Amino acid sequence: MLRFFIIFSVLLIGLFTLEILQPAEKYVILPFTSMVADISVWIVQGFDENVIATGNVIRDKVSGFGVRIERGCNGLEAVIILFSAIFAFPAPFKNKVIGFVAGFFAIQLLNLVRIISLYYLGQWNYTAFEWFHLYLWQALIILDALVVWLIWLRTLPGSRAHPDNLEPETA
């Protein structure tokens, strides 16, 4: 347990430090965040043609309302937490890679739901938008990383999560 905590802490601190460096901002964070905005708009345009993306901003062409996807709103912090937890845990490397890739997409999928819901919530009620943005959705994205990690733990070899590994109860 101590080994896990130390490796988890080192990975977490190291990755969050890398994330705030200027080259990471310029070459990873900003392009990724713009891509998240573009994907969000692509999804929304399936049922609302009045939405556009400009960089990291999603805007309604009619009302002018927009949301800016900033650092901390692109899901990468939750991905860093998940990566640190998965790669700190003693498990086969193949399982770590599979768990991380699946977890990355699970977090980003929920983040797209978050961004789109906040886009429409902000047009409806700005106070509700602020509350959901600052409190509910931030907690849910981090909780998503935790849930993905817990599910991943149950899929590891030797885990008792598989029904065929369970021994029958004795009477």
What are these regions (language model features)?
Residues M1-A171:
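Hydrophobic N-terminal alpha-helices or hydrophobic patches in metabolic proteins across all domains
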